[in-house]
Amino acid sequence: MKIGKNVFIAHSATIIGDVTIDDNVGIFFGAVLRGDQNSIHIGKRSNIQDNVVVHVDRENRTELGENVSVGHGAIVHGATVMDNALIGMGSILLSGSVIEEGAVIGAGAIVTSGKVIGKNCLAVGSPAKIVRCDESVGEQARKNGETYQALMKMHIDGKFTEYSH
């Protein structure tokens, strides 16, 4: 396990096995990163939101690029997510899927094994289908990452009172 500088890891997050977390990453409450059969790499300025599961299989590691946002309750399983992408809440990325730079996966979408979602494309549904590709999609993803960088800093700086029992 390797953890970079200026990283926020919530007390209720669980990180197991071969996991590399680069600088300025946020791992939020209830997230599980389990690199037990292969490796997980989380790129700089990425955020793994509440109750996300990141896992691998023997053939597929999980690779998240820089400034990637993985929304609440999503599952990323043996997938590759390139820079500035946004994975919507409750969505599922199955083994061998590839999410290219600036792509957005809509909430609740299921990206099937081996599927590629192109650069700056929005994909929704089950199974996920591309509905639009343009620069505005990539801009939305990039801005989400910036929002979470500010939020992560507030958590690191102790701006929020936390209660647990």
Which residues make up each language-model segment?
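N-terminal segments that cap or nucleate solenoid repeat domains
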Residues: 1-27
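Glycine-rich hexapeptide-repeat left-handed beta-helix
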Residues: 1-3, 36-44, 50-52, 56, ...
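Short N-terminal helix-initiation segments at or just after the protein's N-terminus
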Residues: 13-17, 67-72
